[in-house]
C-alpha cells in the first residue's frame, strides 16, 4: 500500500473517531438549545454557512489563483466545524460558552448534511469550468464520516454510558492519526507546494481568514465570549472533511491546496487568538447569552 493510499484511509478514520468522541459528550438537548434561541442560531448560520462561503467566492474572484487553491478555499468554507473546535475554546472563554461551542459544533454537523452539498452546487454554478463536483458524493462523505459517527456517539452516550471512560482515549487516537496524516501528507507534497502557490495566493488565504474572523466576531452578539466562539467557528473548519471532499473534485492538487490553506490560516488567526487570551486573562470579557 502506498503512502498516499494509507493517508486516504487514515484521514476518514480520524474524522470518524473524532466525531464519535464528540457525539459521546453531547446530547440532543444541545441542538434544542440553539433552536430555542433563533436569533443566536440565525447569526451563527449566517456567519458560518452564508457569509463564509461568500467571502471565499469573492476572494477567489479577486485573485488569480490556481484552481486547486480555489477548490481548497471553497471546500474549507463549506466544511463543518472541526471536531476539536469545542476543546480549543476552553482556554479562551468561560465554561458556559465552551458549552455553546460544543452545541454550535453539533448543529454544524447536523446541518452540514444538507448545507455542504447545496453550497458546493451553488459554488460550482458560480465558478463554472473551474470547479466540477457531484453534490451527491459530497453528501455521502458528510453522512458517512460525520453524521454517522455523531449518531453512534449519541447512542453510546444514551445506552452505554460506561463507555465514556474511553472517550479521552478515542479523542487522543484521533488527534494522533490526524496529526501523523497531516505531517505525512506535508512530507509527500512538500516538493509540489510551489505548483499551487501563485502571486497573491498567501494574501488571499490570509484575507479570507481575517474577514471570516471579523464576520464571526461582529455577529457573535454583545458577549465577548460569544464573539470569540463564533469568530473561530467561522474559520475553524474540519481539514479532514475538506480534504476528502476536495479529493472528489477534478483537481488532483486540491488536497495540497487544502493543506496550504490550513497552515496559512492557522498562522493568520494567531494574533486574534493571542488577543482573546489576553482579554480573557484580564477579566474584561463578558459571558455570552445563556
Please identify what each model-predicted range represents:
Residues 1-290:
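Alpha-helical transmembrane segments of multi-pass small-molecule/ion transporters
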Amino acid at each position: 500500500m502506498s503512502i498516499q493510499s494509507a493517508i486516504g484511509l487514515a484521514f476518514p478514520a480520524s474524522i470518524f473517531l473524532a466525531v464519535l468522541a464528540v457525539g459521546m459528550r453531547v446530547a440532543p438537548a444541545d441542538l434544542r438549545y440553539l433552536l430555542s434561541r433563533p436569533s443566536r442560531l440565525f447569526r451563527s448560520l449566517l456567519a458560518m454557512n452564508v457569509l463564509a462561503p461568500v467571502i471565499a467566492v469573492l476572494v477567489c474572484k479577486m485573485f488569480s489563483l490556481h484552481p486547486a487553491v480555489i477548490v481548497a478555499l471553497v471546500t474549507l468554507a463549506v466544511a463543518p466545524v472541526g471536531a476539536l473546535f469545542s476543546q480549543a475554546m476552553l482556554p479562551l472563554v468561560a465554561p458556559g460558552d465552551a458549552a455553546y461551542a460544543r452545541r454550535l459544533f453539533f448543529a454544524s454537523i447536523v446541518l452540514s448534511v444538507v448545507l455542504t452539498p447545496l453550497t458546493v452546487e451553488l459554488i460550482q454554478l458560480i465558478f463554472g469550468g473551474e470547479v466540477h463536483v457531484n453534490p451527491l458524493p459530497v453528501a455521502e462523505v458528510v453522512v458517512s464520516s460525520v453524521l454517522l459517527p455523531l449518531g453512534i456517539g449519541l447512542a453510546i452516550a444514551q445506552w452505554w454510558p460506561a463507555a465514556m471512560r474511553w472517550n479521552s482515549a478515542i479523542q487522543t487516537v484521533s488527534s494522533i492519526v490526524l496529526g501523523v496524516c497531516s505531517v505525512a501528507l506535508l512530507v509527500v507534497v512538500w516538493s509540489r507546494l510551489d505548483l499551487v502557490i501563485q502571486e497573491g495566493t498567501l494574501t488571499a488565504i490570509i484575507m479570507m481568514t481575517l474577514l471570516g474572523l471579523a464576520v464571526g466576531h461582529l455577529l457573535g452578539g454583545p458577549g465577548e465570549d460569544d464573539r470569540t466562539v463564533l469568530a473561530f467557528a467561522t474559520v475553524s473548519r474540519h481539514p479532514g472533511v475538506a480534504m476528502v471532499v476536495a479529493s472528489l473534485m477534478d483537481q488532483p492538487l486540491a488536497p495540497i491546496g487544502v493543506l496550504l490553506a490550513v497552515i496559512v490560516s492557522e498562522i493568520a488567526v494567531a494574533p486574534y487568538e493571542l488577543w482573546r487570551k489576553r482579554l480573557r486573562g484580564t477579566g474584561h470579557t463578558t459571558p455570552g447569552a445563556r
